[in-house]
Amino acid sequence: MRPAGTLASFLERCSARKRGRGCVVLTGAGCSTESGIPDYRGPNGQYHRADFVLLTFQKFMRDDNEKRRYWARSMLGYSTMCGASCNAAHMALQAFTKSGAVAHILTQNVDGLHHLATYGGVGDAEEEHYYKYTTSDAPLKELHGNIHNVICTSCGFFMPRARLQRELRERNPGFYEQYGADVSRTRPDGDYSAPTEAVNAMHLVMCPRCNGFFKPHVVLFGENVPKPIVEATMSLVRDKASCLLCLGTSLQVYSAYRYVLQANQLGIPVAIVNAGTTRGDAIADLKLDVESVGSVLAETAHEMLGVPASMFFRRKTIQL
C-alpha cells in the first residue's frame, strides 16, 4: 500500500476507535523545509555544516557581544522567514483541521506557517501583515514560540519582529547589502552565518520602554519550554487525542519526544511520518520513511477528504 493509503487507514481506524476524540498532530522542521526554511538534523541540515556554532540561551543572556552576534545573524537571515509561503504539508493540515479530522496541532516550528495556512498560505512580507504569521483561529500550540515576535528581556515589552527588522535596517544602513548576499550562509529559524566583521559593526535596537535588550520570542537552546504550555499540551494529548501523528520531526529533543512517550504509556496510537529515523521509531505504531511530508499529506487528504492533491500545492484556501 502507498504511504498515503497506509496513513489514511491508520487515521480512520483511530477515529472510529476513539469517538469524541481527534487526531493530535506534532510537527517539526521537516514540515517547513519545502517552504525553503532550512532544518537542523535533516540530510542537509545545519548540524552537518562544519561552521555551525550553537547559540544557547545562557550565552545570549550573559554576553552583550552574543546579543550583537545573534541580531546581526538574525537581521541577515530573517528574510527566509518573513514572507515565506506554506507548502502542501501546511495546507493539507489546514484542510484536515477544517474537516474535523485533526483536532489540535502542536508545533516545534517557530515560523508561523500553520497560522499563515488559515489565510491561504501565500507569503506576505509586508510589515502590517505580520499578524498572518502570529495570529489565527487554528487549534495550534507553538511549543518553541514564534520568530515573528520579540520581547524585551528586562520589562517584557512585546513587539513585532517585522518592526524590529525595519528599525535594525534604519540603524545599520548598508549592513544588509554588504553582508547578506550569500544564500549558502542561510541557517534554520531565520539565522545566518554572519562574518565577525558584521558582528562587530552591528548596532542594536533597544527597547523603547526601558532601553533593555530584545530577545526573539522563541525558546533558545538551553531554555525550557514554559511550564504552562507543557501542562496544557500534555493534558490535551491525554484528554483529547485519538492518536498522535508526528510529522517532519526526528523527535531528538525531549520537548517533542515527551508526547510520544506519554501517548505510548496511555495506549494512544502513534504514527510518525519523517525523512529518516527518529527517536520514537521503536515505540511507534506506524512509521513511514518518506522523501516529502507534504506530498504524503496531500495524497492522504485526497483519499480521506476527496480534495484533489494538486490543490494543496497551489497555496490557496481549500473549500471543503
From Swiss-Prot:
It catalyses: N(6)-acetyl-L-lysyl-[protein] + NAD(+) + H2O = 2''-O-acetyl-ADP-D-ribose + nicotinamide + L-lysyl-[protein]. Residues 1-22 form a transit peptide. NAD(+) binds at residues 28-48, 108-111, 248-250, 274-276, 294. Belongs to the sirtuin family. Class II subfamily. It comes from Leishmania major. Its cofactor is Zn(2+). The active site is at 144 (proton acceptor). Keywords: Metal-binding, Mitochondrion, NAD, Transferase, Transit peptide, Zinc. The gene is SIR2rp2. Binds 1 zinc ion per subunit. GO terms for cellular component: mitochondrial matrix. One of its GO terms (molecular function) is NAD+ binding. Its EC number is 2.3.1.286. NAD-dependent protein deacylase. Catalyzes the NAD-dependent hydrolysis of acyl groups from lysine residues. Residues 23-320 form the Deacetylase sirtuin-type domain. Zn(2+) binds at residues 152, 155, 207, 210. This is NAD-dependent protein deacylase SIR2rp2. It is found in: Mitochondrion matrix. Pfam families: SIR2.
